[in-house]
A protein has these predicted regions:
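Short, amphipathic C-terminal "tail helix"
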Residues: 188-193
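Conserved DEDDh/DEDDy metal-dependent 3′-5′ exonuclease domain
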Residues: 50-122
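Conserved RNase H-like, two-metal-ion catalytic cores of nucleic-acid enzymes
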Residues: 2-71, 75
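Short, motif-level signal for alpha-helix interfacial/capping segments enriched in acidic residues
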Residues: 2-3, 82-84, 136-137
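Acidic, Mg2+-coordinating catalytic module of metal-dependent nucleases/exonucleases
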Residues: 128-187
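A polyampholytic, Gly/Pro-enriched intrinsically disordered region
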Residues: 117-133
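Acidic active-site catalytic centers that drive phospho-/nucleotidyl reactions
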Residues: 21-23, 105, 158
Length: 193
């Protein structure tokens, strides 16, 4: 039996899943602590839209366009997007993004099941055999050095890893990770694409 078609499918439109990540201009230490994420400033934000089939890179000047794309999405998928990326973006808008965007935060979902956090690199490396190409501190250093292209490449790769982890989990109903003893484990997920 085939599942019923969604309103979008009946209208001939595909569901728009928007994969999202951003990098910041400043560290938590620079702004006085992790409770001041809204002061970190976005250096670049990157999305991948399944409806458009393309990546988009947003500078700080285009943050309103980024927010609008997230609000219009049928689903926003990110890794630590609720407690980090949205908090940074809320330094630019009065909108309550965690409550106004339909969101699947892969890290939060995994944490609920395991009782502890995993990083994107741990899940992507074990599930896909590919790891991250840097970290947020690299991106901040590149920002200070004016190396915006490196930030864009790094952030695009993180968005791609997030997309591939989501698709892997949706297909296999689990994702893999290596625990602190380097033992390969898996965690069941109920994600859909």
């Amino acid at each position: 039996m085939t599942p019923p078609r969604s309103r979008l499918q009946r209208a001939g439109m595909s569901r728009d899943i928007v994969y999202f990540d951003l990098e910041t201009q400043r560290t938590a230490n620079d702004v006085g602590g992790w409770d001041k994420k809204r002061d970190m400033g976005m250096s670049l934000g990157v999305t991948y839209s399944t409806r458009l089939g393309e990546y988009q890179i947003f500078s700080e000047k285009r943050v309103d366009d980024l927010v609008q794309q997230l609000l219009r999405a049928d689903l926003v998928v990110g890794f630590n997007v609720i407690n980090f990326d949205y908090e940074v973006l809320m330094g630019y808008t009065v909108l309550d993004l965690p409550h106004q965007c339909r969101t699947l935060d892969l890290m939060v979902d995994i944490e609920k099941k395991l009782g502890h956090r995993l990083g994107l690199d741990a899940v992507a490396s074990a599930s896909l055999g590919v790891g991250k190409t840097g970290d947020g501190l690299d991106a901040i250093r590149w920002w200070r050095e004016g190396r915006v292209l490196e930030i864009a490449e790094y952030c695009c790769f993180d968005v791609k890893c997030t997309k591939l982890v989501h698709e892997f989990g949706a297909t296999n109903k689990k994702v893999l990770y290596d625990d602190r003893f380097k033992q390969r484990k898996n965690v069941a997920v109920e994600w859909v694409v």
